[in-house]
């Protein structure tokens, strides 16, 4: 009877440790996935900077100043370029 009780307690302890380890592994994998959008956002920021620069250059050649309203979403016009605020 004591052996059965000890075996059940050991199995329960192993199950708890295994579940805790699995939760930690899942949390780590989610943290790694969170970093991915940052690289995607960096690419979008670079693309946006390029688009705004080209837009301002086209307007500049057409004897117009860079329009501040063209720069939106955390961007502002500075030195005839849209820059991230």
Swiss-Prot record:
<dbReference type="GO" id="GO:0005576">
    <property type="term" value="C:extracellular region"/>
</dbReference>
<dbReference type="GO" id="GO:0035792">
    <property type="term" value="C:host cell postsynaptic membrane"/>
</dbReference>
<dbReference type="GO" id="GO:0090729">
    <property type="term" value="F:toxin activity"/>
</dbReference>
<feature type="disulfide bond">
    <location>
        <begin position="52"/>
        <end position="66"/>
    </location>
</feature>
<dbReference type="InterPro" id="IPR012625">
    <property type="entry name" value="Hwtx-2-like"/>
</dbReference>
<keyword id="KW-0732">Signal</keyword>
<keyword id="KW-0964">Secreted</keyword>
<comment type="function">
    <text>Neurotoxin active on both insects and mammals.</text>
</comment>
<keyword id="KW-1015">Disulfide bond</keyword>
<keyword id="KW-0629">Postsynaptic neurotoxin</keyword>
<feature type="disulfide bond">
    <location>
        <begin position="71"/>
        <end position="82"/>
    </location>
</feature>
<comment type="similarity">
    <text>Belongs to the neurotoxin 12 (Hwtx-2) family. 02 (Hwtx-2) subfamily.</text>
</comment>
<protein>
    <recommendedName>
        <fullName>U4-theraphotoxin-Hhn1a</fullName>
    </recommendedName>
</protein>
<comment type="subunit">
    <text>Monomer.</text>
</comment>
<dbReference type="Pfam" id="PF08089">
    <property type="entry name" value="Toxin_20"/>
</dbReference>
<keyword id="KW-0528">Neurotoxin</keyword>
<keyword id="KW-0800">Toxin</keyword>
<feature type="disulfide bond">
    <location>
        <begin position="56"/>
        <end position="77"/>
    </location>
</feature>
<feature type="propeptide">
    <location>
        <begin position="23"/>
        <end position="48"/>
    </location>
</feature>
<feature type="signal peptide">
    <location>
        <begin position="1"/>
        <end position="22"/>
    </location>
</feature>
